[in-house]
């Protein structure tokens, strides 16, 4: 029996996110006269086994999931973030699928393959794995949309920056806006009371543009207030 690949599960998960009512049928050949979308078989646009299947500019070959994401991703989260997500999430899965280089997420999904001596139906195992992949993918995409929604709020605070310190009225994902900016620090209300302060990293070195003094590290609130001069 055919072992299910991670590309199958995430491809199906992506399609179900785009259309929750879609009916997905596994098979080894495209039925004659079939007019629906086909991936991973059939030598069509979403079958990476086809001759001259596309390869990314960085050399990472596409698998079915990557081909579907290239088509659908920009419609879900916009072209810029779709490209970032391809690089961080989709490409490693495509690379493992094409080369067998190893990927921990692929190993987790592979745990849903039916055992060689088990009684589980392959289609049931596939459905369970797709449900996991769909839940994971949906949360990743919603996280990206959350960052997108924060952009206007963070940019507004950046416009009020003083002494390279950005003050947010509430916590919001700030890195995409502040790392490329001249901001060195960001402060916002802490869930534990008071305020939280973070250094903004440099885009190239990934180190704080201006680190806090080493002597502040690990100090209790009272001592930190004394050393920093901030009550």
Please name every model-derived segment.
Residues 18-22, 73-81, 205:
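Short helix-capping/linker segments at secondary-structure and domain boundaries
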Residues 36-115:
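A basic- and aromatic-enriched beta-loop-alpha substructure that forms the phosphate/nucleotide-
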């Amino acid at each position: 029996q055919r072992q299910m690949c991670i590309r199958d599960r995430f491809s199906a998960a992506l399609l179900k996110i785009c259309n929750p009512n879609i009916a997905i049928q596994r098979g080894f050949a495209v039925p004659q006269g079939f007019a629906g979308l086909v991936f991973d078989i059939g030598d069509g646009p979403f079958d990476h086994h086809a001759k001259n299947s596309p390869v990314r500019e960085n050399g990472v070959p596409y698998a079915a999931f990557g081909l579907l994401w290239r088509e659908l991703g920009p419609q879900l989260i916009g072209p810029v973030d779709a490209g970032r997500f391809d690089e961080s999430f989709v490409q490693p899965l495509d690379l493992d699928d094409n080369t067998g280089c190893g990927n921990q997420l692929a190993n987790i999904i592979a745990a849903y393959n039916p055992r060689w001596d088990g009684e589980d139906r392959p289609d049931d195992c596939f459905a369970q794995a797709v449900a996991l992949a769909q839940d994971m993918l949906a949360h990743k995409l919603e996280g990206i949309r959350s960052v997108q929604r924060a952009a206007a709020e963070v940019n507004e605070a950046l416009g009020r920056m003083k002494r390279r310190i950005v003050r947010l009225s509430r916590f919001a994902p700030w890195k995409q806006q502040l790392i490329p900016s001249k901001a060195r620090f960001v402060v916002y209300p802490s869930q534990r009371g008071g305020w939280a302060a973070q250094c903004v990293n440099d885009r190239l070195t990934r180190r704080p543009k201006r680190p806090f003094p080493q002597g502040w590290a690990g100090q209790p609130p009272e001592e930190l207030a004394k050393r920093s001069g901030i009550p």
